[in-house]
Structure formats: structure tokens, C-alpha cells
């Protein structure tokens, strides 16, 4: 089987996305690679496809347990034998997994960077053929990155202890030129193929709101996006609790996530979000890295993040499936002071000397200034982000850059009028924030501004907008079926099939194996597992429609 056969058989795709094939070919030719690709561009396939074509094992160094579980779960569902080794497993489970790996059962093993330093894992690694080491979230290796992890610095020493140097591939979605240079140097990549597909996420609409009544804004937004999944980020636990309580009191289906909750609560709440039981989560920035939920339709920042890197990473959790989604930042000057406090009172890193820590604090304050400038710019928000990462977008129109997809480039009078109603807390309604869903609906009726707001007139389209009314009904039926299957097999719904795959089913209406395998995202293993039950659901839906028409 060649690379195209692997792509179709396991992952259900007929062709590679831009940039993927170049990196796959480089790896198969034995070259090191560095892929800097935006979230949702398909970085994982760049190493997963060649891993299945090489003779040995591919080790994927990954920073988060949740990310490993998601990736391994998705691979297993696709028919790929993969495993993860991290602290969530017992010693017995780790011993068993490594024994299976020695027997050749696993082609891909995800491992935490700390695990590379243990004698047991090194002993395993020196007795098996390792074809490639993939460094995921590679920006974690740089002290200049926003997510520096000292354990990443030990990857190269691990490589040097192996009998034969494997191919090294590294991937990240966010890397300034300084971080990129660190990745190349610290991992000692040899004549690497470097691919930057660009940081632009054209499916994301960026908005900055200078408003004071943030609670009313969020409440109205969620009321008008009841069917959508989203994340609301807050800077503090206190704000998470406040926003969660307000939304919950108004009858909205939300959950919460922050470090103050017990491990059991965090897992339960995270699962509620991932499994679409609670479509919206209110969280601190501790939430999200490693969450591969593809159908997040909006990310709202209740507070301004500390830097553009953090903002773009967090906002980038919207629209991973490539469908239109919104990223809204609610700015207030108080956010600057909160972030300065966090920077100046950050816990010292014992792995960095005092002089270096002082330099990093200066850098963090510069990053904060850049974040504030983003919130205050009157120019294109997308252009600001791209230039920050060293990319200059094409401007064929000349003059001021216009992306036609941010709040500074698209002036919506109805949206501006709606925003004016949120300028002063308490100005918009005579009563305080409503305490139940009925009152929320009444507020929406009574507020002309809200009725005309961009939530109803937004230019961004929902994925299912490609469908007619019956198609949307079928899409919702298939989503419900997907949720039931996901719960029964214990994986997130998007691991079964993405929204994009379900929409393609609704458009193609498959009734046999050949037709189902033509649906984007349906590989042979997924067809064997779920093809018939989804085709039966489609048939039952259409049969019901026919009977209704016959009456």
C-alpha cells in the first residue's frame, strides 16, 4: 500500500491538504522535517501516514495526556494499532504496552517527554527499531515560546542514546521566527525540510468588542447560538465561576473547568463538553490544549490573554474542521492590570537562572503590549496576527489591507448598534440579568438592538448551511446517532465522524458500500464499524419523509 492507499484506507481521504504531501514525501525519503501549520491543517497526518509505511515504530512526543488519549483513540477507531505511555497508566499497564510494542503490535506510540528520561523506557527504546521521533507542539522546546516545558530539552539526549539516529519530525501551529530557530537548533535537525503553510485560518472570523456589559453580551450570544458548541475563556477562576453561574441561572447548558476543581470534576466536565452533553464550557486557559474537538463553532475571550501566541492558540480551537467559526475578544482596560499582575507574580522556574528570568519577564511584558495593540488597532485584525508571526499577507487590492472577515474590515451597522447597548452595565435593561430561560427570551424580544445584532445577521455561515431544510433534519439525526455510538464505545463524537463527514453523508445520501466510501472521512475500517448503521439511519429518515408526503 502506498501513501495514497494509507490515506484512503485508514483516514478516508482521497487527497492530501496543502503542505501535507511535501512533508510526507520528505519523511519517506529519510529527511528531518519541521512543519509550521495552522490548527486544523492536518499536522497529524503528516507523520501518521509515513509512520504506517516505515518498518519500525514512530514515537510521538506529546505534552498532554488528554491529547495522547484523543489521538490514540482516533487512530484505533481508524484501524491503526497505536498506544500511549504516560502517568495515567499503572506500572502494570506500561509494562504490558511496552511488551506488546516489542512484539510489533504498535506502529505509533505517544509518549510524554518526561518518560524519555526513565531507565525502563530507554531500555525498551534501545531494543526496538525506532524509525521516527515526532515532536508534537514543538514550540514547547523554546524558552521564548509561550508554553516552554523544560522536559522537551531532554529529547535530543534521548535520541543520542539510541543505536541509530531516527528521522526527527517536529510540528507546531504557533512559532515566531525566534521559536522556529530554537526548534531547529535544540532538536539538532539535519538538513530539514521546513514547511510553513501560513498562519492564516480563513474560516475564522475575528472580532474585538470594547464593551463593559460582558455578561449580557455573552448571554445574548449563547441564546442565539443554542445549537453551537463553544468555549468561553476567563482569566481567573473567580470569573469562570461568575460567568458559569450567570449562564446556568439563565437555563443555558454549560459546564466549567479550572484548576480549583477536583480531578474528578475536571474530567467529568471535560467529558461533558467533548461528548456534546454540555455544548459550552467556561474555562481558564488551563483548558483546551490537547482537546481535539473539531466542531467548536465559537471561542469567546471574556478577558484579554497575555499574548498573541496564547490568544491565537486558544482562539484556534474554533473551527478545527475547517467550517466557519467565530473568535470574539471582549476587551476592557482592567485586563491589562490583571495580566501584568500574573506576569510579575509568576512562580519562578528552577531550571532558569535569575538573569534569564528577568529577560523573560521583559519579553512577556512586550508580548502583553502587542496583545493590547491588537485590541486597539483600527486595522485588519487578521493582518495584525499574521504580521506578528512574520507573515505578510497578499494584498492584491492595494491600500489598506481588507480580509473581509474581521470586525475592523467588515463594518456591520446592526452589530455596532447592538454593541452600543452593551457599553454600560445595567443600561440595556431595566431589570438585572434574567434568572430563567423564559425571561431571557423576553429580553431578546424587548431589545431591538439584540434583535438586530450580528448574532442574527452574521456573515459567517454554519456548516449545515450547505444543506436544505430536510438535509438539516437528517444532519441532526446523524449527529444524535453519532453521540449515542460515541457514548457506547467510549470515544468523543468527533472521533466517530466529523461534522464535515456527516454533512457529506447528507449531500451524497449513500446506500451501499461504494457510495459510503466516497464520503470524505469514511475509511474502510470506519465503514466496517459504522457504515451500515449510518446508512440504515439515512434510509429510515428518507422512508419516514416519503410516508409523511404520502399522507
Where are these regions (language model features)?
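Accessory DNA-binding and partner-docking regions appended to nucleic-acid-acting proteins
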Residues: 1-3, 337-338, 347-356, 363-365, ...
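Helicase motor core with emphasis on the C-terminal RecA-like subdomain
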Residues: 1-10, 14, 18, 22-44, ...
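Short alpha-helical "packing" element that flanks the helix-turn-helix/winged-helix DNA-binding module
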Residues: 20-23, 371, 502
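Short alpha-helical segment immediately N-terminal to, or the first helix within
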Residues: 26, 301, 374, 504-505
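Conserved Rossmann-like nucleotide-cofactor binding loop
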Residues: 66
Amino acid at each position: 500500500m502506498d501513501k495514497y492507499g494509507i490515506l484512503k484506507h485508514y483516514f478516508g481521504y482521497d487527497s492530501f491538504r496543502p503542505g501535507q504531501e511535501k512533508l510526507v514525501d520528505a519523511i519517506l525519503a529519510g529527511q528531518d522535517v519541521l512543519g509550521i501549520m495552522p490548527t486544523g491543517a492536518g499536522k497529524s497526518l503528516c507523520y501518521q501516514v509515513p509512520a504506517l509505511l516505515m518498518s519500525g515504530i514512530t514515537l510521538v512526543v506529546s505534552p498532554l495526556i488528554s491529547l495522547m488519549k484523543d489521538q490514540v483513540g482516533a487512530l484505533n477507531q481508524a484501524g491503526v494499532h497505536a498506544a500511549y505511555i504516560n502517568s495515567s497508566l499503572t506500572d502494570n499497564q506500561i509494562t504490558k504496552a511496552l511488551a506488546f510494542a516489542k512484539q510489533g503490535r504498535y506502529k505509533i506510540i505517544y509518549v510524554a517527554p518526561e518518560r524519555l528520561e526513565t531507565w525502563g523506557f530507554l531500555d525498551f527504546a534501545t531494543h526496538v527499531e525506532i524509525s521516527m521521533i515526532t515532536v508534537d507542539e514543538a514550540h514547547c522546546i523554546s524558552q521564548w515560546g509561550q508554553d516552554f516545558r523544560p522536559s522537551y530539552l531532554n529529547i535530543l539526549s534521548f535520541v543520542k542514546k539510541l543505536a541509530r539516529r531516527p528521522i526527527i519530525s517536529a510540528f507546531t501551529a504557533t512559532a515566531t521566527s525566534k521559536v522556529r530557530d530554537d526548534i531547529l537548533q535544540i532538536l539538532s535537525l539535519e538538513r530539514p525540510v521546513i514547511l510553513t503553510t501560513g498562519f492564516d485560518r480563513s474560516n475564522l472570523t475575528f472580532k474585538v468588542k470594547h464593551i463593559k456589559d460582558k455578561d449580557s453580551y455573552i448571554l445574548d450570544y449563547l441564546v442565539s447560538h443554542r445549537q453551537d458548541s463553544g468555549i468561553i475563556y476567563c482569566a481567573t477562576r473567580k470569573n469562570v465561576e461568575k460567568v458559569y453561574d450567570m449562564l446556568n441561572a439563565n437555563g443555558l447548558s454549560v459546564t466549567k473547568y479550572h484548576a480549583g476543581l477536583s480531578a474528578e470534576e475536571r474530567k467529568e466536565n471535560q467529558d461533558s463538553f467533548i461528548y456534546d452533553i454540555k455544548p459550552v464550557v467556561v474555562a481558564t486557559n488551563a483548558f483546551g490544549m490537547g482537546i481535539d474537538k473539531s466542531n467548536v463553532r465559537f471561542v469567546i475571550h471574556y478577558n484579554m490573554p497575555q499574548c498573541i501566541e496564547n490568544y491565537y492558540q486558544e482562539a484556534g480551537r474554533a473551527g478545527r474542521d475547517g467550517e466557519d467559526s467565530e473568535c470574539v475578544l471582549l476587551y476592557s482596560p482592567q485586563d491589562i492590570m490583571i495580566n501584568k499582575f500574573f506576569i510579575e507574580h509568576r512562580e519562578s522556574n528552577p531550571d532558569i537562572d535569575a538573569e534569564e528570568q528577568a529577560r523573560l519577564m521583559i519579553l512577556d511584558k512586550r508580548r502583553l503590549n502587542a496583545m493590547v495593540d491588537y485590541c486597539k488597532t483600527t486595522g485588519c485584525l487578521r493582518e495584525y496576527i499574521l504580521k506578528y508571526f512574520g507573515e505578510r499577507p497578499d494584498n492584491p487590492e492595494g491600500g489598506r489591507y481588507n480580509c473581509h472577515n474581521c470586525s475592523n474590515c467588515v463594518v456591520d451597522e446592526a452589530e455596532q448598534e447592538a454593541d452600543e447597548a452593551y457599553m454600560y452595565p445595567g443600561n440595556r435593561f431595566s431589570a438585572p440579568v434574567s434568572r430563567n430561560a423564559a425571561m431571557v427570551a423576553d429580553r431578546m424580544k424587548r431589545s431591538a438592538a439584540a434583535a438586530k445584532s450580528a448574532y442574527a445577521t452574521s456573515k459567517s455561515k454554519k456548516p449545515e448551511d450547505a444543506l436544505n431544510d430536510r438535509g438539516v433534519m437528517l444532519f441532526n439525526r446523524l449527529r444524535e446517532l453519532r453521540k449515542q455510538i460515541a457514548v457506547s464505545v467510549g470515544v468523543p463524537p468527533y472521533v466517530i465522524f466529523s461534522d464535515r463527514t456527516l454533512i457529506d453523508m447528507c449531500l451524497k445520501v449513500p446506500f451501499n458500500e461504494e457510495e459510503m466510501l466516497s464520503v470524505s472521512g469514511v475509511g474502510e475500517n470506519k465503514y466496517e464499524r459504522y457504515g451500515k448503521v449510518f446508512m440504515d439511519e439515512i434510509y429510515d429518515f428518507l422512508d419516514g419523509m416519503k410516508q409523511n408526503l404520502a399522507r
